[in-house]
């Protein structure tokens, strides 16, 4: 099992949580980005640099992730594709995507895209709060406990 990170848009504070978790869990952590990233030295942490371009990193994560892996992303279509492959998906605010919730999120995303295309300013998400960081760490821990139980 591997934790895949859509690293170009992932907040640094979330990456720091993931670095510590990868060491503690002894779990491979792969940060996929179209730019160079500085990561702590670790046998569990690596970066995968992809070409710049629309959805290049997302497509690489989808290509390589497998059932049982965890994908960290705020990108709804990427999360949907990861779930289709049997991976778990978690956003940096600690929201676990599920087959039941991903359809709703895709619909809302498409609606917001339509509003923006018509000239309506929709604004962006709030900045990451302490509560978001705690929720992320808690959901990551829940995923890890589930992995441990499945291993016996």
UniProtKB/Swiss-Prot annotation:
CDD domains: PIN_YqxD-like. It holds the Pfam family DUF188. Transmembrane segments: none annotated. InterPro entries: UPF0178. Belongs to the UPF0178 family. This is UPF0178 protein YaiI. It comes from Escherichia coli O81 (strain ED1a). The lineage of its organism: Bacteria, Pseudomonadati, Pseudomonadota, Gammaproteobacteria, Enterobacterales. The gene is yaiI.
């Amino acid at each position: 099992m591997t934790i895949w990170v859509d690293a170009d848009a992932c907040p640094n504070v979330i990456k720091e949580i993931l670095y510590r978790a990868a060491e503690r869990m002894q779990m491979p952590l792969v940060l996929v980005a179209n730019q160079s990233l500085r990561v702590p030295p670790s046998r569990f942490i690596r970066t995968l640099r992809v070409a710049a371009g629309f959805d290049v990193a997302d497509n690489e994560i989808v290509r390589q992730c497998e059932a049982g892996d965890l994908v960290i992303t705020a990108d709804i279509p990427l999360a949907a594709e990861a779930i289709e492959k049997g991976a778990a998906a978690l956003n940096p605010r600690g929201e676990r995507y599920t087959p039941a919730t991903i359809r709703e999120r895709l619909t809302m995303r498409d609606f917001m895209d339509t509003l923006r295309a018509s000239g309506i300013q929709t604004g962006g998400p709030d900045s990451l709060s302490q509560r978001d960081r705690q929720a992320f760490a808690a959901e990551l821990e829940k995923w890890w406990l589930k992995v441990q139980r499945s291993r016996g």
